[in-house]
């Protein structure tokens, strides 16, 4: 029994370390992408005539699909080349990561108390992390 407890704790520790590693990797990828976006902004703007649907909403979590549609439009209208290729590769990796995370939204059926606990946390996030628009 003691060995089982040790193995369980070891497994939890490994999962935690793995989650931290993925989070750190994603943080570095986003930071690199922001740098590339700054560096290549003028090239991406081009002649400035490209019109891309841009969300008005400031709660970016709600507009993920629209943001990535805009990225696809920008990618299709930008001259290919090594200069921006890494930027678009990074954006694709970020989208893949978000898509994988969205798969965690579908869950199992739990008792109402667990759902209410989740709902309470969800509303707390909306209350503290989202900008409320009028």
Swiss-Prot record:
GO terms for molecular function: cytokine activity; growth factor activity; interleukin-5 receptor binding. Keywords: Cytokine, Disulfide bond, Glycoprotein, Growth factor, Secreted, Signal. It comes from the Eukaryota. The keyword Signal applies. Residues 1-21 form the signal peptide. GO terms for cellular component: extracellular space. GO terms for biological process: immune response; interleukin-5-mediated signaling pathway; positive regulation of DNA-templated transcription; positive regulation of immunoglobulin production; positive regulation of podosome assembly. Its main location: secreted. Gene3D superfamilies: 1.20.1250.10. The keyword Cytoplasm does not apply. It is found in: Secreted. Glycans are attached at residues 76, 90. Belongs to the IL-5 family. Homodimer; disulfide-linked. Interacts with IL5RA. Interacts with CSF2RB. PANTHER family: INTERLEUKIN-5. Homodimeric cytokine expressed predominantly by T-lymphocytes and NK cells that plays an important role in the survival, differentiation, and chemotaxis of eosinophils. Also acts on activated and resting B-cells to induce immunoglobulin production, growth, and differentiation. Mechanistically, exerts its biological effects through a receptor composed of IL5RA subunit and the cytokine receptor common subunit beta/CSF2RB. This is Interleukin-5. It comes from Sus scrofa (Pig). The gene is IL5.
């Amino acid at each position: 029994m003691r060995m089982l407890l040790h193995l369980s704790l070891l497994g939890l520790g490994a999962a935690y370390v793995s989650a931290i590693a993925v989070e750190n990797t994603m943080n570095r990828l986003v930071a690199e992408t922001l740098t590339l976006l700054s560096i290549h902004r003028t090239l991406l703007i081009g002649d400035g005539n490209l019109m891309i649907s841009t969300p008005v909403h400031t709660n970016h979590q709600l507009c993920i699909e629209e943001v990535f549609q805009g990225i696809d439009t920008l990618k299709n209208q930008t001259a290919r080349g090594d200069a921006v290729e890494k930027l678009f590769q990074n954006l694709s990796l970020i989208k893949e990561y978000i898509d994988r995370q969205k798969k965690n939204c579908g869950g199992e059926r739990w008792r109402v108390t667990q759902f209410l606990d989740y709902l309470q946390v969800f509303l707390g996030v909306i209350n503290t992390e989202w900008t409320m628009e009028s």
